[in-house]
Amino acid sequence: MQLKVPEHQVAGHIAKDGKPGPLVDDKGRFFKPLQGDSRGEIEVKFYESFSSNTEVPEHIHRYFPVYHGTQAVEGSDGAAMMVLENLLAEYTKPSVMDVKMGSRTWYPDASEEYIQKCLKKDTGTTTVSSGFRISGFEVYDHKESSFWKPERKLLRGLDVDGARLTLRKFVSSNSLSDTGSKPDSAFASSVYGGSHGILTQLLELKTWFENQTLYHFNSCSILMVYENESILKGNDDDARPQVKLVDFAHVLDGNGVIDHNFLGGLCSFINFIREILQSPDESADS
């Protein structure tokens, strides 16, 4: 089995200090290392519960990666990894964005130290003010014929206007390395709009979250991806915009209570996307 480091990872853990990072194979599978503490166990437990939960509607299952169990992987010191669907396997030049949801990223019963660590990030980003923060993104810059990805520390400093600008950049055709140019949002209607676009998918998720009380998705992310190459070739219908939920290390049982933290962030994020669709040509302030 040939494994390699993912080309387009925009957020999450990477190989560091002797600890393995995620890997992908050529069969459309993504290998995610189990975190050594309870987080790895919680994420496996969630996937096992969710994948067999008949209370979750079939059309909602498609917003989550397919789970293939766990496996010890050679070359990673035999570390156990979750085997998931590689969400980018079918994309040639994917543009990808990771958005952490909720106005609070810690979970009930977390230690005071962990709460303070999360609170520092939450208050210093758009998490508290907008109910989400952009953790990472990468787009294919066709003018430069290369992928462009900002440093994570720059994203951590985004305010509300910066988040709005970044969501425009994600669907723009002009060069993103040129900081003096305004994003043109040229791909907004192809990616965010339409009957199969990002907004439609987010609204379908919102309908479910307005009623579901099975799980609370603490510190979970929405991953958005689309095929940049198809748009550049003029085939907007093959942009294949896709929304997936990822990162479930802090998911807890819902205990019959609506997940207002995630739902509130989702509603806010939907408003940002809808605003861009309503005014795609609007010049955004830098």
Curated annotation (Swiss-Prot):
It is found in: Nucleus; Cell membrane. Detected in leaves, stems, roots, siliques and flowers. Highly expressed in root tissues, anthers, the stigma, pollen grains and growing pollen tubes. Residues 1-22 are annotated as: Disordered. It catalyses: 1D-myo-inositol 1,4,5-trisphosphate + 2 ATP = 1D-myo-inositol 1,3,4,5,6-pentakisphosphate + 2 ADP + 2 H(+); 1D-myo-inositol 1,3,4,6-tetrakisphosphate + ATP = 1D-myo-inositol 1,3,4,5,6-pentakisphosphate + ADP + H(+). It comes from the Eukaryota. Induction: Not induced by auxin. The keyword Nucleus applies. Its EC number is 2.7.1.140, 2.7.1.151. It is an enzyme of class 2 (transferase). Keywords: ATP-binding, Cell membrane, Kinase, Membrane, Nucleotide-binding, Nucleus, Transferase. GO terms for molecular function: ATP binding; inositol-1,2,3,4,6-pentakisphosphate 5-kinase activity; inositol-1,3,4,6-tetrakisphosphate 5-kinase activity; inositol-1,4,5,6-tetrakisphosphate 3-kinase activity; inositol-1,4,5-trisphosphate 6-kinase activity. GO terms for biological process: embryo development ending in seed dormancy; inositol phosphate biosynthetic process; pollen development; pollen germination; pollen tube growth; pollen tube guidance. InterPro entries: IPK, IPK_sf. Phosphorylated. Its main location: nucleus. One of its GO terms (cellular component) is plasma membrane. The keyword Membrane applies. Inositol phosphate kinase with a broad substrate specificity. Does not bind calmodulin. Belongs to the inositol phosphokinase (IPK) family. This is Inositol polyphosphate multikinase alpha. It comes from Arabidopsis thaliana.
